[in-house]
Structure formats: structure tokens, C-alpha cells
A protein has these predicted regions:
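Acidic catalytic loop of the alpha/beta-hydrolase fold
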Residues: 177-182, 212
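Serine-hydrolase catalytic machinery in alpha/beta-hydrolase-like enzymes
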Residues: 20-44, 50-118
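A domain-start/cap signature at the N-terminus of enzymes
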Residues: 1-53, 128-132, 189-193, 198-203, ...
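Short glycine-rich catalytic loops that host catalytic nucleophiles or stabilize transition states
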Residues: 203-210
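Primarily recognizes the serine-hydrolase "nucleophile elbow" in alpha/beta-hydrolase
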Residues: 115-117, 123-167
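Short alpha-helix in the alpha/beta-hydrolase fold that links the catalytic acid
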Residues: 70, 182-193
Length: 229
């Protein structure tokens, strides 16, 4: 049953009342895997009595959890965000290499541990990513729109949801001079109209630049996440 759920890209973990004590503020390893594990950042303002927004951040091809978090760590304390990052089993995410499965399983375990240890605002659970991670965030986020209320995709290349659940709000950004995932080549200028035509509330931000996440764009995305109704 669990294998079928993973192959369908489905996540089972949900926010709940914590039953364990989480780590104090700062950056911590998840301790779920001996290699290619993951990280969680707990903001200084975190309180058990005040559930915090959660952002699951996914790295690009060849990346890791530390690299994924570098776009957002400086904003976590400002916005009071719990930041979670896991690492793909291969050099990039499973559906890009082959099909859904091993990475969904790892993400579900990381989320289950996070929900068990920390008070998470169920109304602000975001999946985010950069490059291949952005493509995976769109794919997994739409498939699990009954869990993720927000999807943030920095420079995505495609989306491959298995199904559509819920009504997550979506933020997409892309550089007009991106040499890695050109904005016109099956990327954001095609993805955004498809999402809007399907009925998703989508905010789109183009910027002059390449395959990066400018500081003002990441800040705009976090403001959007924490202020959208």
C-alpha cells in the first residue's frame, strides 16, 4: 500500500498536535538517513502555542539540503518560518529520473517527523523549489494540494502532477535571460497560462536575470506566503 502511494506521488503526513519536543532555534539535521539526509531550520520566534508556517524547500539538480535553504534561511526569522529541506535519492528528483517513488517516501518521513515535533500552521504549508526542485514542487504540490496550501516555484522547467487535489495558491518566478531553463522553452511562460486556465490562483514574477533567485524575489514570495488569505 505504501509503495503504491509513493508511486502515485501521494503524501500521507498531515499537521497535527505535536507529541514530541522539537529542537531549539537554529539549523538541525533530520537524522532520517545515513547519507543525503535533510535539514530543518527553526526560527527564533517559534513557540509551541503559536503554530508556524512551514516551507518544504527542494534543491535543484546535483544540489543538497544546505544549498536549497540558502535562498530562504536569511528570511526565516523575519517571517517566523519553519524551513524543511530533504535531499533526493539520485542526483535529482525521482519523477525527473524515472517515476515517483523513493523521494516521495523520504519527503513523507521528513514531514511526519516535523509534524510530530513542531506546531505547524495547517493554513500555511508550502512546498517550494528552485530549478528541478521547482518543477518537482509544482508536480508534488498540485498532486497533494489537500496538504500544501501554497506552491512556490523559482525557475521551473515543467510540471508532471499525477492528479489535482485541493486549490493551492501558486507563486512562480523566472529570469528573462535564464540560460539553463529558458523562459520561453516549455518553461514558465507556458506553465503559468496552463495553471491559470485550469483555475489556479497564480502570481507570476519575471525579472531581468539568469538562473537565480534574486533576494527581492525570495522576499516577495515569503511576504506572499505569510499574507495571502
Amino acid at each position: 500500500m505504501r509503495n503504491l502511494q509513493c508511486q502515485a506521488g501521494q503524501l500521507l503526513s498531515r499537521p497535527s498536535v505535536p507529541t514530541e519536543t522539537g529542537a531549539s532555534s537554529g539549523l538541525h539535521s533530520l537524522g532520517l538517513e545515513p547519507e543525503r539526509d535533510g535539514l530543518i531550520y527553526v526560527p527564533e520566534s517559534y513557540q509551541l502555542a503559536k503554530p508556524a508556517p512551514l516551507v518544504l524547500m527542494l534543491h535543484g539538480a546535483g544540489g543538497d539540503a544546505e544549498g536549497a535553504l540558502r535562498w530562504l534561511t536569511g528570511l526565516a526569522d523575519t517571517y517566523g518560518l519553519l524551513l524543511l529541506a530533504v535531499e533526493s535519492r539520485d542526483r535529482t528528483w525521482d519523477v525527473i529520473v524515472s517515476r515517483y517513488g523513493p523521494d516521495i517516501a523520504v519527503i513523507d518521513r521528513a514531514l511526519e517527523q516535523t509534524f510530530r515535533r513542531y506546531a505547524v500552521d495547517a493554513g500555511r504549508v508550502a512546498i517550494a523549489g528552485f530549478s528541478d526542485g521547482a518543477s518537482y514542487a509544482l508536480s508534488v504540490g498540485i498532486t497533494n494540494g489537500d496538504l500544501f496550501t501554497h506552491i512556490i516555484a523559482f525557475s521551473p522547467g515543467f510540471m508532471a502532477p499525477v492528479t489535482q487535489r485541493g486549490e493551492p495558491q501558486i507563486f512562480i518566478s523566472h529570469g528573462t535571460s535564464d540560460p539553463v531553463l529558458p523562459i520561453n522553452h516549455r518553461c514558465s511562460r507556458r506553465i503559468v497560462p496552463q495553471l491559470q486556465q485550469t483555475g489556479y490562483d497564480t502570481r507570476y514574477r519575471e525579472f531581468e536575470g539568469g538562473h537565480i533567485v534574486p533576494a527581492d524575489v525570495s522576499r516577495e514570495a515569503m511576504t506572499w506566503l505569510t499574507t495571502q488569505a
